[in-house]
From Swiss-Prot:
InterPro entries tied to this protein: Coa3 (IPR041752), Coa3_cc (IPR018628)
Assembly and binders: Component of 250-400 kDa complexes called cytochrome oxidase assembly intermediates or COA complexes.
Protein's name in the database: Cytochrome c oxidase assembly factor 3, mitochondrial
Organism expressing this protein natively: Lodderomyces elongisporus (strain ATCC 11503 / CBS 2605 / JCM 1781 / NBRC 1676 / NRRL YB-4239)
Transmembrane feature ranges: 12-34
Keywords: Membrane, Mitochondrion, Mitochondrion inner membrane, Transmembrane, Transmembrane helix
Residues exposed to the Mitochondrial matrix side: 1-11
Keyword NAD: no
Alphabetical list of PANTHER family matching this protein: CYTOCHROME C OXIDASE ASSEMBLY FACTOR 3 HOMOLOG, MITOCHONDRIAL (PTHR15642:SF3), CYTOCHROME C OXIDASE ASSEMBLY FACTOR 3, MITOCHONDRIAL (PTHR15642)
UniProt record, GO biological process: mitochondrial cytochrome c oxidase assembly
GO cellular component: mitochondrial inner membrane
Bilayer topology annotation: Single-pass membrane protein
Similarity comment text for this entry: Belongs to the COA3 family.
Length: 68
């Protein structure tokens, strides 16, 4: 880059850098909030529906057939 181009861009450098951090912090804050809430969540209170042995063997066969 030429020295003239550096001089033209100089007034905007710090404003653009600050804008980058402000705009970039919004999705990072959303990801951080989501991650902390998901790690705190306790799934032990959700009941697991019972499954019969016949249905379990059927599902295992379907799974094994899908792997091959």
């Amino acid at each position: 880059m030429t020295p003239a181009l550096y001089r033209v861009r100089q007034p905007f450098f710090w404003r653009n850098t600050i804008s980058l951090f402000v705009i970039g912090s919004i999705p990072l804050a959303a990801y951080w909030y989501t991650f902390t809430k998901m790690t705190e969540d306790e799934f032990s209170d959700i009941p697991i529906p019972p499954i019969s042995d016949e249905e379990l063997t059927k599902l295992k066969k379907e799974y094994e057939a899908g792997k091959q």
